A protein has these predicted regions:
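Cytosolic-facing regulatory segments adjacent to core modules
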Residues: 2-89, 103
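Feature marks short, surface-exposed loop/turn motifs that line or immediately flank catalytic pockets
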Residues: 20, 101, 140-143
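Glycine-rich anion/phosphate-binding loops
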Residues: 75, 112-113
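Hydrophobic "anchor" residues on beta-strands that sit immediately upstream
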Residues: 92
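Conserved Walker B
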Residues: 98
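Conserved ATPase-coupling elements of RecA-like P-loop NTPase cores
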Residues: 102-109
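Phosphate-binding/switch region of NTP-binding enzymes
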Residues: 113-168
Length: 168
């Protein structure tokens, strides 16, 4: 969002976890620095209304393209990404989050193999389009149980259903 709002670089966000409405509510609260509960209630001070009006213009003018298709396949994403780059000059793609994607039409021995295939496909797409693709990922719960400050720092091996993501 910041890349689109403050630097005016076109960004595509594929949100498999949250709806457009949920994302927009979160962004408005973040950009305006006003708690979402306060915005929803409408109980804002005059200066907060002014801030909301001023900051919303930045958000509305941002070249941000959001797709909240649930259970998006890597093939559907590839088609949409190519179109967004061609038609809107998208400079970065963000996927929230990797493990909710699927590689429809293909059969796999395990979910780990499927996620690895999706990861490799995204890497190939990034090379083809010559833009970064950032795929968010969930972590295994083991991170929470490790001792000490350094122990809680996530490592590539902590990625859920990671398989070959470390190599991609």
């Amino acid at each position: 969002k910041n890349i689109a709002v403050y630097f005016r670089n076109p960004v595509a966000l594929f949100s498999l976890e949250m709806s457009n409405v949920q994302l927009v509510n979160r962004w408005i609260s973040n950009v305006c620095e006003i708690p979402s509960e306060k915005i929803k209630s409408g109980q804002l001070a005059d200066y907060e209304w002014q801030q909301l009006d001023y900051k919303l213009r930045d958000l509305l003018d941002a070249p941000l393209y959001v797709d909240d298709t649930p259970s998006l396949s890597v093939f559907e994403l590839r088609t949409k990404a190519r179109r967004l780059v061609r038609e809107h000059g998208v400079k970065i793609i963000i996927i929230d989050y990797l493990q909710l994607m699927n590689a429809s039409g293909m059969s796999f021995g395990s979910r780990q193999e499927e996620v690895s295939t999706i990861s490799r496909s995204l890497k190939g797409l990034a090379k083809e389009l010559n833009i970064p693709i950032i795929a968010l990922s969930q972590l295994n719960r083991g991170v929470e149980n490790r001792e000490g400050e350094e122990g809680k720092r996530p490592q590539l091996s902590d990625l859920r259903e990671s398989g070959a993501i470390e190599q991609d």
